[in-house]
Design a protein with these regions (language model features):
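Extended, Lys/Arg-enriched charged tracts that mediate electrostatic binding to polyanionic substrates
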Residues: 78-93
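Helix-start/capping segments and mature chain N-termini
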Residues: 1-65, 69, 91, 98-301
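Short boundary motifs at domain starts and secondary-structure transition points
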Residues: 77-78, 101
Length: 301
């Protein structure tokens, strides 16, 4: 069933005890179906569960559940070359009834799947962002590094405003000083300069598995990788900037508007060479076109 029944006092409904993951299964060039780095997603869910005091699903249970869902929905895995994939959404919620502010004693772990089309409907094109200085996604020592529902609820107002104003989403800054870049919408951020892949380091940023993979690919391509604070003022020094995450893999950015300072940072109208190479390499690994030398894919046979 696509519906669940729970007590109206379940902690997920009152106190936000909810964590989730986002991952994909691909049909490769060889016809085989593979999931991309599911063990990393499992570890991140365990981290999220610890962050809001929920029972932790074991790694193997998590991965086996995802495999089972893919097998049961095998006919919905899009064909190779379509640019589409089967999206998986593992969810962990507190279902135990609890009126006081305490962790639940019962939890539900579930996984659903749905086919999704290619993210870039009209080709791999850059997008525009604006800086959100009047909204914070997460506090420095809060839940920003966990994939929990509250972080996304906190981004809805600013995200919808950005879309209404013609932007893809907004750039969130560090909540303490509003001078450093945290995230790009629901994705991580990276910039390229002097053959270096630079991505923010902060306790309020969700550790992206896509970003982790791109860092490794950048090193494989002979680039230097820096994980460090990135000030807003440094944007003008980057040759390329982009957002990265499960949905798009890489979303090149060609414009970032800073309303407070009435300043617009601009890049090329077409995706940069490095961003394109990173995107094509990671996509190639996911669908079996490029050798998976780090053994990231888990086959579903």
């Amino acid at each position: 069933s696509e519906e669940i029944v729970m007590h109206m006092a379940a902690t997920v409904l009152h106190y936000g005890q909810a964590a989730f993951e986002g991952m994909k299964a691909f049909r490769g060039k060889d016809g085989r179906i593979r999931m991309f780095r599911p063990y990393e997603n499992a570890r991140r869910m365990i981290s999220s569960a610890k962050g809001v005091l929920m029972a932790e699903p074991p790694e193997e249970l998590y991965v086996e559940a995802c495999k089972k869902v893919v097998k049961l929905n095998e006919k919905f895995v899009p064909p190779y070359g379509s640019g589409a994939s089967l999206y998986l959404r593992p969810i962990l919620v507190g279902t135990g009834a609890q009126v006081g502010v305490h962790p639940a004693k019962e939890y539900l772990f579930m996984v659903f799947a749905c086919p999704v089309g290619p993210y870039f409907k009209e080709g791999f094109k850059p997008v525009r962002f604006e800086i959100a200085r009047d909204y914070d996604r997460a506090a420095p020592f809060g839940t920003g590094k966990y994939k929990v529902g509250g972080n996304y609820a906190a981004s809805l107002v600013s995200g919808e405003r950005a879309v209404k104003e013609g932007y893809s989403n907004c750039i969130y800054l560090d909540a303490a000083t509003h001078t450093y870049i945290d995230e790009a919408g629901a994705a991580n951020f990276f910039g390229i300069k002097n053959n270096t892949y630079c991505t923010p380091s902060s306790t309020s940023i969700l550790p992206s598995i896509t970003n982790m993979s791109l860092c490794q690919i950048a090193e494989d391509l002979g680039m230097k990788v820096e994980r460090r604070p990135i000030a807003v003022g440094e944007l003008s020094e980057f040759e390329e900037v982009a957002a990265c995450g499960t949905a798009a893999v890489v979303s090149p950015i060609n414009e970032i508007f800073d309303r407070e300072n009435n300043k617009t940072y601009k890049w090329g109208a077409e995706p940069g060479k490095v961003s394109t190479k990173l995107y094509e390499t990671l996509k190639g690994i996911q669908n079996g076109q490029i050798e998976d030398k780090h053994n990231w894919n888990v086959f579903v046979d």
